[in-house]
From Swiss-Prot:
It comes from Homo sapiens. Residues 40-68, 179-213 form a coiled coil. GO terms for molecular function: extracellular matrix binding; identical protein binding. This is Olfactomedin-like protein 2B. Its main location: secreted. The keyword Disulfide bond applies. Keywords: Coiled coil, Disulfide bond, Glycoprotein, Secreted, Signal.
Amino acid sequence: MAKPRLLVLYFALIVVPAWVSSIVLTGTSEPPDAQTVAPAEDETLQNEADNQENVLSQLLGDYDKVKAMSEGSDCQCKCVVRPLGRDACQRINAGASRKEDFYTVETITSGSSCKCACVAPPSALNPCEGDFRLQKLREADSQDLKLSTIIDMLEGAFYGLDLLKLHSVTTKLVGRVDKLEEEVSKNLTKENEQIKEDMEEIRTEMNKRGKENCSENILDSMPDIRSALQRDAAAAYAHPEYEERFLQEETVSQQINSIELLQTRPLALPEVVKSQRPLQRQVHLRGRPASQPTVIRGITYYKAKVSEEENDIEEQQDEFFSGDNGVDLLIEDQLLRHNGLMTSVTRRPAATRQGHSTAVTSDLNARTAPWSSALPQPSTSDPSIANHASVGPTLQTTSVSPDPTRESVLQPSPQVPATTVAHTATQQPAAPAPPAVSPREALMEAMHTVPVPPTTVRTDSLGKDAPAGWGTTPASPTLSPEEEDDIRNVIGRCKDTLSTITGPTTQNTYGRNEGAWMKDPLAKDERIYVTNYYYGNTLVEFRNLENFKQGRWSNSYKLPYSWIGTGHVVYNGAFYYNRAFTRNIIKYDLKQRYVAAWAMLHDVAYEEATPWRWQGHSDVDFAVDENGLWLIYPALDDEGFSQEVIVLSKLNAADLSTQKETTWRTGLRRNFYGNCFVICGVLYAVDSYNQRNANISYAFDTHTNTQIVPRLLFENEYSYTTQIDYNPKDRLLYAWDNGHQVTYHVIFAY
């Protein structure tokens, strides 16, 4: 082993200095000759060559150190090694060894229960080991050694080569060479940059000299150019009043053009002459900076002004960005929000006007009388008229109604009260309801002579047993008891019968194989509610679909009673579900977190011992459509042969009561269908929940009391659908299919 090591060290000592010296020489801008090399550079190269042995010793020193390995707590180990020298190997080979020609390893330990071990490569301890093994291999042929002995010797020689040490030394040498190359490249880059700068300076100086020479030649060849230019300049500045006179003529021409333009407009009426400020303020409002935007919802039109009023252009430009501009237009915060039932118009009180304001106000009152009288007014004699409160500061005018018994007065209101509508329980004849009118359209109609017919709301009565109306929510206006079973004014009317259901769109993968996810159709936000599994007592809320995909829930509701099945719904801020193992249905208020209503289904055919497995559908299933809340459950047919039938009943969302007039017994049978849902008062049932290509094989129309077999294709993409619910707000079917949350688009036939 000693000979290969000596060869490697000798090669490194010879090659590396020559390589380094060649690199250093090539790094200069001009290669020096032998005579031009300074004595200082020769001394530096010689010192570097002499120090190569020290550098290699430093490279090998940290590797040749013996490593100490310790075991135990509070243990400190130290290894002291005394290796053999090269002369010791020679004495051992010559047979004249001494007592000190042995390497020793001493272990120094400190600490309780401490175990130390010293690890070192053989070449670091006994440099004679390589020579000894090489000699043995050479004598193997003459001594007829066994193959196993040769293998042992080869293995020892292989380990004695100490390839790890060679690799470490090579890596460090390569690192040093890389550093040298990096430094040389930096020096070359700096020198190149310096050369470029010198070249730029030389080029700039040459250009300057060339221009100076050219200018001198031009001046020499054309001596009269400078004098001619001086004469022209003197002529141009000889009359200083010329520029002022030109500007004055331009201003006069602009004034003449503006006067001619204004004279072409027709003159206005005499009573409109003094109205100047409102027009200026409206124009100034349009010129506000972009940092204070104003949304204009209404425009007041005035007749043309005389030419004298239009000449005040400079005054308008001076006040263009002033803060004294009055606001006489409708802005977004003052508008009454259109909820689909009522229409109102509000205006800010105008500034004090003279002459013209009185005429316009009287004319506006005279023209808006039919329109104002059409608004519903509070009256004890006719309870079908609705009480409507205006919003924001309004124009205090009293309109003259054609009917003296119904007088309409618009009063200012500082706050926005809740809009309520009162109706009678019995139907009364009413005119057909025209389409809703926006505030801007109503204002424009009020300024014309054509009156708008009165708007009335027609509702259907359910009889004397109609329950109380729902509470108001931020997402929908308060409805009367007759209108609580028909929310088409809030969500939208049905377009027609169901035509097609598109393929499923996977929105998320969440939870277990069974579960339900739903949205509140009457909510203003996009919150998603999830019940994981078909039994439990926790309802999880997500802020929107994106948070649901990320698994970031925003709220959790611990229900006082457990639910069973997947037929729950969230409707008008409440969670409706079937209490586990009972005939009870519960309405849980999500905002107040309490049980708002409780009811028992006396005729439900409930299985007392429900097996702990999914049967393909829920025994009690809630549904929501454009008409409100529905309940689907199995019951015994009292009129027939006491068979179980599926009952569809319109459910009162306030107290969970049902009525016989709105309860239908369908032709469905339990355990013969998968999932069902209601769209526009029609019950649809899917024939299978665990087949990929299923069909909507049953439909019952509550409007005509007829049932058909539509045979519409319904795809269970993951072949395990445990919930299908219709949302009338976005007209989508929400389904839970084997742990995947999917949606279906509903297409209607026109």
